[in-house]
Amino acid sequence: MPMNNFLDEFNLFDSIITMMKNDPCCVEDYEPIVENLNRIFQRTFNDEEHRKSMANSQLFWERLRDTLEAMLLPASLNENSSIPYTRTVRGLILMMRNLAAENQEIPQKLLLQNLVIRGFLHATSEYVVDTPLIKHLYIACLTCLFNIQQNYSTVDMTTFPALLQFLQYPYGIKLEDGEEEEHFWLPYLFLFKTYLNNDEFSNEFFRDNDTPQKDYYCVRDRIFFDIVTAKFIQDQENSFLIEKGRNYLDDSKLEITSIDLSVLECISKSLTTASFGKYLNGLEERQPGKFTTLLQILQLVVTSKEDWNTYELTAIMSWCYPILQRLACKDIPAFFNKSCNDYAPSVAIQLHSTLLSCLDIISDLCKFNHVRKFLISYDSVKILVSLLDTFQKNLLRINFLKGNGDTVNEIKITDHEGNKIEDRLLIFNRVNTNESFIRADNFPHCKLVIIEILASLVYAHPEIQDQIRELGGLALILSNCVIDDNDPFIKERSIVCLKFLLKNNAKNQEYVKKMEAQDVVQDDALSKAGFEISVEKGGKVRLVSKEEDPGNENSEIISIDED
């Protein structure tokens, strides 16, 4: 299209450049510029043919770029001139936004997304007085960047520090409910997700750094947690509960909006980033409370998706499994080695929430063969059996005995050997007997999930069958074939695990038979696991599968008679 078709626009651009060179503080000079800019901007809305002509002209984009560049001169503005200045910058960016809806290739080629960010940062610099228009300028920049990058995504890492500055601007900014908030969040989250899709950006964003400067982590925490993640927490505040001595996310109370879904998509992309584990470890040290809440959200995201690929599964396990290792080998044994008076209740709440989130993530991902192989290769069976043993020796077994209805008439509290607990301080720290709930100090539901994971690992895996027995895990599984309100349905999970441990494994069957002879094993547990004790002529004892016919001499019954 001939240049004279853009005559009005080019004259406007020339006027802006001339004003910025001569006297950017002259309020009167802005008046005709703002008026003409508004008229031309409206034409980009109403005249589709003209809008497309401008959008497809590289020359027009270059002139628009040069004009916005001219607005970034290091000239100090007073309060009166800052308002029309900001309005002019916003008008140019809104024009760019409308054109980018038609053409993304040219503005990306010219790296205009970088210029938009620079334009906003200049408007918030010491050269420009802060005005209420800044917030509207930011939303204009977001929507412009949204349009530029909706089909083409280019991240210029040379501008990474400026990009972080731009992304952290909303920290502490109050948005009006309704249209303003919606216009902010969707493009903001889209942009952040776009940047996270760039491996170079995401790895640099979450990368650990040895610098003692708090600003390095502060800006990242502000963007990822205080802005993005906090939006979900704020919207779902009724789902994040700290009650009955526990801290957890009740997903039955979630009411996910389109904005919340975008937040979760950003988090989903983040948790598979190679450097995410280092960021997570650092966040736990800097802000333990935020770490716990974030881990609960990670648990929700990971367990809600069914199609993780191998790379993503490895990335998730690379941060989740080390947390479990540390808890199992260090933090939890240390917790039980201390007196009840040596720690605050919040310590147990933090430990329990962190452990349960990690266990639940791993248990859910065990449906993938890749994760099972990962766990076996990293000696997880030894760690899980050791943790189960720690819990077995230290947790109280609790039974809420109810009469008619849901009223608890009596609470039975014993140790792992069935001995009644008399220590009133210990009971107080573990159970609220007045309201009949179990505190985090007794790590409710944790043994249950450990056994679920072990069942996944041992299924059709003879080496793991033997390893669990050799580590003492078979005895632990047997001893949990009981009803325990600290771990509802642990009996059923233990029976499933026991079935997998015994299947086609003579040594495990022999071990169980010896335990049964000592009245350690409950017959109903064996029965539900698909086995039964068979006493034959001469007093010989066999543990046989209920699927086999013990009277059939040709059936493949494994004899476990003692010599």
Curated annotation (Swiss-Prot):
The modification Phosphothreonine is found at T433. The gene is CTR86. Its main location: cytoplasm. It comes from Saccharomyces cerevisiae (strain ATCC 204508 / S288c). One of its GO terms (biological process) is cell division. Present with 8970 molecules/cell in log phase SD medium. Residues 544-563 are annotated as: Disordered. SUPFAM superfamilies: ARM repeat. The modification Phosphoserine is found at S559. May play a role in the regulation of cytokinesis. Keywords: Cell cycle, Cell division, Cytoplasm, Phosphoprotein. It is found in: Cytoplasm. InterPro entries: ARM-like, ARM-type_fold, Ataxin-10/CTR86_families, Ataxin-10_domain. The keyword Hydrolase does not apply. One of its GO terms (cellular component) is cytoplasm. Belongs to the ataxin-10 family. This is Ataxin-10 homolog. The keyword Cell division applies.
